[in-house]
Amino acid sequence: MKEFDYSKLKDRTWDNEILTYVAQIHEYKGKQELYMQQKPVELKRLIEIAKIQSTESSNEIEGIVTTNARLKQLVEDKTTPRNRDEEEILGYRNVLNIVHESYDAIPIRSNYILQLHGELLKYTAFSYAGKYKNTPNEIDMVLESGEKIVLFKPLEPYETPDAVECLCNEFEKAIDEKIVNPLILIPNFILDFLCIHPFNDGNGRMSRLITLLLMYRSGYFVGQYISMEKAIADTKEAYYAALQKADQNWYEGENDPKPFIKYMLGIVLSCYRDLEKRIMLTEKSGKKSTAYDIVKAYTAGTIGRFSKKDALVSCPSLGSSSIEAALKKLVEEGAIIRTGAGRKTMYMKKTD
């Protein structure tokens, strides 16, 4: 049976890049607590935006898609699913809500992971929802010649239940005994989870939901306000490259998890920086600022083209109509240029 022993992490040497990531994220964690006290309105708006982006991005990575309008309706519980993709999207939204609202009541145990998987596929007809895999699930790649090569071979179905149980026990023990910083431990757990590949379907989505769960339980809440799933989707190639480097010789216990740890810490840090940028924009505009002032300050800091949706995400204190009116005024004043029409409308700063 594959065994896990996180006590060995205590004796490992972590390079300066990882230690710098950890130190910077820890500093942002302190700012996060200040934001939660002083910026509740802006953060509430960011939560709603992040939910939509997280649900969209995590599913899109797996090729599960719907229209923007349908996605928003599904996330806001204003419609019912029309097809299998929408059934899976709705399931993700439900688990995301559970993690957001009850993270402190969800221990890292095998039976809870199974329950979350059951919720993920709750609206589908899949018979394996909430159950560990019953068939092998090699990770393959098909070459242009048509030849199929095996990139990674996860654990066999019969090994999976005990492996997940052991993995969860080791994680909880490492957290309780403070063996290593949670920011280093969490990516290790997620890497091992992905290498086990415990389900017939939904492993990637479950790994991202569990990442949020573990981060929240350790006091890092940036994923509530800035979509970590979107950050991963935007760097998908780097994600898979880091995973492939980190899973080499995993079964023998001789793999090097550092590439995946660095990638995940980079994602967390980028999300914290994004959060700070959005909060600072509201502070820079001032309490008496109008929607026009806030949007103008946002556009001044943009590089290249941006959409109304981008402005809405970056100005969490404003509604859609306020942003639209501000953009219209800025176009009329010649401060920004509008291109395209309808859904393809884009804006950019007017250069000298």
Sequence positions of predicted segments:
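FIC/Doc superfamily catalytic core
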Residues: 1-352
